[in-house]
Amino acid sequence: MDGIKYAVFTDKSIRLLGKNQYTSNVESGSTRTEIKHWVELFFGVKVIAMNSHRLPGKGRRMGPTMGHTMHYRRMIITLQPGYSIPPLRKKRT
């Protein structure tokens, strides 16, 4: 799964889980059809809708100069009723 980076767990994304919608950050160059194909192939689910938005990068100071991080894209994926994505495993610390 090259295009999907990681799942996002914010207040809004946790609320959307009740509507069978899953949120994840993806590579900014990925298209909707690529992400839909990867999700359906990897998780074995049926996607009925996808919403995406681009989030801006953050400013980072490096001494006297100001830099920034790259922007990224977030996808909200809606699955057909009856399908679900299994919970993701936590990283070991």
From Swiss-Prot:
Any single Gene Ontology cellular-component annotation: ribosome
Pfam family, one: Ribosomal_L23
Subcellular location: Plastid, Chloroplast
Highest taxon in the source lineage: Eukaryota
GO biological process: translation
Main location: plastid
GO molecular function term, any single one: mRNA binding
Keywords (A to Z) from UniProt: Chloroplast, Plastid, Ribonucleoprotein, Ribosomal protein, RNA-binding, rRNA-binding
Family affiliation: Belongs to the universal ribosomal protein uL23 family.
Record's function text: Binds to 23S rRNA.
Subunit and partners: Part of the 50S ribosomal subunit.
Record's protein name: Large ribosomal subunit protein uL23c
